[in-house]
Regions:
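Primarily NTPase-proximal linker/entry elements flanking Walker-type ATP/GTP-binding cores
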Residues: 16, 20-151, 158-178, 186-194, ...
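Short beta-alpha junctions and helix-cap segments that line functional grooves
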Residues: 3, 104-106, 135, 251-252, ...
Length: 319
């Protein structure tokens, strides 16, 4: 795994533990859906549809999965209920694979320029600043020089929290006083990072989704100002979502996608919820890659998302 700081086995154990509630919920419902049935018929498919929707996979993605299973049943003439788990696993894996982003297996950065700039967006309370802090730690563990920019200048708590993370991880935080222009903070951050040979920059932003026009203009201005320092910036616009909110995360994702172009997703708080199906639905509906998932409180519990490992863990497949 290159310079990734811990072993695959530990990562898989964290993933299994983090998805425990989702797995228990889905497979308990699945067992009830096929109870007393030997073959997959319309009743089983209706029950499966309900299982997926109540597991926060989302209506559109659920209907897509059901249609594919219906086609398979029609083609094979007879499909036993004992085969349903395997078929469902195949279809979920295929859906995630269609979002043809490459899974990263280490914390190396794409591109041949420095620094690599990640603009982080998301509403307050989803774990945005915590995710930035944990990402900073992961990148630092991988030998990267990291800079943080506190461009959420509307909340004193946001700047303060980012500074605490900066101290904890041991990386510089560029900030200005409360109420400053967020674009000015972004400009200063990139200027300092570039001058000091940083490898990666993470910029925190305000999550004021209730004022869409204001947020759209603010993010556009931040991007425009960044380009004055680095024409390629930002390399990534990452939306942080709270996985435990299920369908609310869906709605937030759609609303943010309408405000600015999102290029990657970080889905947090999956360890305390049975709503892990939201990962499948959001990835399918937005056609934006899930890049990171949060599976616990520890620094290393923020993991690079790997589609195959996620499906294998969900269906308890060992390699």
């Amino acid at each position: 795994m290159g310079i990734f700081g811990f072993f695959n086995k530990d990562k898989r154990e964290t993933l299994d533990k983090g998805l425990e509630k989702t797995k228990t919920s889905v497979f308990d419902k699945l067992a009830r859906a096929v109870a007393g049935k030997s073959k997959v018929d319309d009743d089983v498919l209706d029950n499966l549809e309900e299982v997926l929707i109540t597991s926060d996979v989302g209506v559109d993605t659920t209907l897509k999965i059901i249609q594919r299973i219906e086609e398979r049943v029609a083609r094979d003439k007879y499909v036993s209920t004992s085969e349903l788990n395997g078929i469902l696993r195949d279809e979920i894996a295929a859906l995630l694979a269609e979002n043809n982003s490459e899974d990263q297996d280490n914390w190396d950065l794409p591109g041949d320029h420095k620094p690599y700039v990640i603009l982080v967006v998301g509403v307050n309370g989803v774990g945005k600043t915590t995710t930035i802090g944990k990402l900073a730690w992961q990148f630092k563990q991988a030998g990267k020089k990291v800079y943080l920019g506190a461009a959420d200048t509307f909340r004193a708590a946001a700047v303060e929290q980012l500074c605490i993370w900066g101290e904890r991880v041991g990386v510089p935080v560029v900030k200005q006083q409360m109420g400053s222009d967020p674009a000015s903070v972004a400009f200063d951050t990139l200027s300092s990072a570039k001058a000091n040979g940083a490898d990666v920059v993470l910029i925190d932003t305000a999550g004021r989704l209730h004022n869409k026009v204001g947020l759209m203009n603010e993010l556009k201005k931040i991007k425009d100002v960044m380009k004055k320092v680095l024409p390629e910036a930002p390399d990534e616009v990452m939306l942080v979502l709270d996985g435990s909110t299920g369908q609310n995360a869906f709605e937030q994702a759609k609303q943010f996608a309408a405000v600015t172009q999102i290029t990657s997703l970080a889905i947090t708080k999956l360890d305390g919820t049975a709503k892990g199906g939201v990962v499948i639905g959001i990835s399918d509906q937005l056609k934006v890659p899930v890049k990171y998932i949060g599976l616990g409180e520890k620094m290393e519990d923020l993991q690079l998302f790997n589609k195959r490992q996620f499906v294998d863990s969900l269906f308890n497949i060992e390699h």
